[in-house]
């Protein structure tokens, strides 16, 4: 039997789990204080829903579940790989939320302000900050089409990060509609814009030449590709310059409002920036998109945007929706690398007792010590020195004994 967790998935030791519990608790506390309510959805979703979710490259990373019994046999006989699976693990929390809202909308307030903190799964190539099983902390607003929804999500998400001591970050904001308008004016066909946007989103990773090469590989019009390359080469891409190529000035006005308002809310505690190349990889985004970046990590530590068409796939009528997700694993990893300590956390000690001790008295003494410490009750080992060394290595700061009033504090403390 293999003892190691599967590649891209992790076992968590008690010290890390304790820290994660605290961080998640502070995030939830911030979300709830702002009027958001938590829900849960199943980890498995219907493959038809997953396939039609416009999830971009994530659709290639779905963990699929094979059909069972006679259904699997029948599927194998078709020779069609797509017939083999009828369900899969969710790759994010947006599709499940959209299905949930469509099924329960008559029982929910409008606008619906919702929290989801849960595990998602992607068949990634594991690397630092990129796992196959990971936690997302999402907040979404469904039923509000105004840019105030974006402003509120940015405000609540940044306050959650600040409340856990995560600082020095930048909120990057863009609007897909402005970018799409500019690209269409350059000669890209409307039905290719999603593909062009996804390539343009890689600007920071592959550079202008890489973007040009990838668009050329997609056999898009040379004149349009060159127009985009010339625009990038011209220097700083300002919002006004991009907006001038967009047919609807109201879209640019909304983006300017969100940028200005978010910057005012930041009050110097973090940065807010217009990022013209920001697209987000998921195809379901329809308007504004945002990401949070920081110097300690090469990718985004949080991201989201508006997805006004997703719920409509289930209902047949459009429901405005926008969400923001904190990449919990990445944020926790950065904080742990910085030596993060839980503020005001009680230190933990052990109360050791011998086999002839009165156990109710042991529990009573442990209770009397818990005003000052977190106390674990353990039987005393035959080799006390070795036992104390193991306890110290496990993070205990000291040991108490039934026959002594004082607490033995370990040397490193």
PLM regions and their residue ranges:
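Short Asp/Glu-rich motifs
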Residues: 50-51, 180, 202, 387
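Short, structured secondary-structure boundary patches
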Residues: 51-66, 190-194, 292-295, 396-402
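Short glycine/threonine-rich loop-to-helix capping motif typified by GTGT followed
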Residues: 54, 180-190, 283-290, 337
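Glycine-rich, mobile lid/loop segments that gate access to catalytic sites or pores
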Residues: 170-181
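Acidic, His- and aromatic-enriched active-site or binding-groove loops in soluble protein domains
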Residues: 58-74, 187-211
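TRNA-binding/sensing appendages of the translation machinery
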Residues: 1-91, 95, 103, 151, ...
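Positively charged, Gly/Ser-enriched RNA/tRNA-binding surfaces
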Residues: 19-36, 45-46, 81-84, 92-106, ...
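Charged, compositionally biased N-terminal leader segments and the immediate start
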Residues: 1-4, 183, 188, 195
């Amino acid at each position: 039997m293999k003892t190691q967790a599967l590649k891209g998935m992790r076992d968590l030791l008690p010290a890390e789990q304790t820290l994660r519990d605290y961080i998640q608790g502070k995030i939830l506390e911030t979300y709830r204080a702002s009027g958001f309510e938590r829900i849960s959805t199943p980890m498995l979703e219907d493959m038809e829903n997953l396939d039609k979710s416009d999830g971009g490259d994530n659709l290639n990373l779905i963990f699929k579940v094979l059909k069972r019994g006679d259904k699997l046999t029948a599927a194998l006989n078709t020779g069609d790989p797509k017939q083999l699976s009828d369900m899969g693990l969710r790759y994010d929390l947006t599709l499940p939320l959209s299905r949930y809202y469509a099924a329960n909308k008559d029982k929910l307030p409008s606008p619906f302000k919702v929290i989801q903190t849960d595990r998602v799964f992607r068949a990634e190539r594991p690397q630092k900050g990129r796992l196959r099983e990971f936690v997302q902390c999402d907040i979404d607003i469904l039923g509000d089409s105004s840019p105030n929804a974006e402003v509120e999500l940015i405000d609540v998400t940044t306050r959650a990060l600040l409340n856990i001591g995560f600082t020095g970050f930048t909120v990057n904001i863009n609007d897909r509609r402005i970018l799409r308008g500019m690209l269409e004016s350059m000669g890209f066909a409307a039905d290719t814009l999603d593909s062009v946007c996804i390539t343009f989103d890689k600007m920071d990773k592959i550079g202008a030449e890489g973007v040009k090469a990838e668009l050329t590989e997609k056999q898009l019009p040379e004149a349009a590709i060159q127009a985009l390359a010339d625009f990038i080469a011209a220097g700083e891409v300002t919002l006004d310059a991009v907006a001038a190529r967009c047919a609807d000035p109201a879209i640019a006005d909304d983006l300017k409002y969100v940028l200005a308002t978010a910057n005012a809310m930041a009050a110097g505690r973090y940065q807010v920036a217009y990022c013209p190349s920001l697209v987000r990889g998921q195809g379901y985004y329809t308007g504004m998109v945002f990401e949070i970046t920081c110097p300690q990590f090469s990718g985004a530590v949080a991201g989201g945007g508006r997805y006004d068409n997703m719920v409509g796939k289930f209902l047949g009528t459009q429901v405005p929706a926008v969400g923001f997700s904190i990449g919990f694993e990445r944020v926790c990893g950065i904080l742990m690398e910085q030596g993060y300590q839980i503020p005001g956390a009680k230190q933990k000690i052990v109360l050791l007792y011998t086999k002839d001790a009165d156990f109710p008295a042991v529990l009573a003494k442990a209770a009397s010590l818990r005003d000052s410490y977190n106390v674990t009750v353990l039987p005393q080992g035959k080799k006390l020195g070795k036992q104390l060394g193991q306890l110290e290595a496990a993070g205990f700061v000291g040991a108490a004994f039934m026959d002594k009033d004082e607490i033995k504090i370990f040397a490193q403390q």
